[in-house]
Design a protein with these regions (language model features):
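Active-site-adjacent structural elements in enzyme catalytic cores
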Residues: 1-163
Length: 163
């Protein structure tokens, strides 16, 4: 029997589905852009969605690390979507917050507003922090990554090699 497959994450987290159904496969279109010739299995899987006019880059990783990576990349005409705890780092940029790091319900409520608000702005690029994939984070991250056309920078620290 083929396990169930999550095509588009939403308000019911993957963990809740798995608690009832057992293992649930996550379709690759949830985490990456479909290649030319690949057919989407559900509406909204293939194309950029909810994308502002300015190009978006999503920075993944621990919140502190992703904030530092954004700080390293931003310029005076950049926009930033970040967690509330890091908004003060970006005093020279236009900033819209997702909410507190630990409150994915608030982040889910604010993600589209943060993206859309930049359409009335003169920013030339947007950098966005991304929550981890636990709980609603999978859906929030999916929406941010789709808006970015899956232009994602891994802000995770490289592993240390022990000799």
């Amino acid at each position: 029997c083929t396990p169930p497959r999550l095509l588009r994450p939403g308000g019911l987290p993957l963990e809740s589905l798995e608690a009832v159904l057992g293992h649930v496969d996550v379709d690759k279109a949830v985490v990456s852009l479909l290649k030319d010739g690949e057919r989407p299995k559900a509406p909204g899987m293939k194309y950029r969605h909810y994308a502002p006019k300015a190009p978006v880059t999503v920075i993944t990783g621990a919140p502190e690390k992703s904030a530092q990576e954004i700080l390293r990349r931003v310029g005076p005409t950049s926009g930033v979507i970040c967690f509330e705890e890091f908004a003060d780092l970006f005093r020279e940029q236009e900033v819209h917050t997702l909410g507190p790091v630990g409150d994915k319900l608030v982040q889910a409520q604010r993600v589209f507003d943060a993206l859309r608000t930049f359409d009335t702005s003169d920013v030339t690029e947007i950098f966005a922090q991304c929550p981890d994939n636990r709980g609603l984070g999978l859906a929030i991250g999916n929406r941010l990554k789709k808006a970015a056309g899956f232009h994602v920078v891994d802000g995770f620290e490289p592993p240390t090699l022990c000799l």
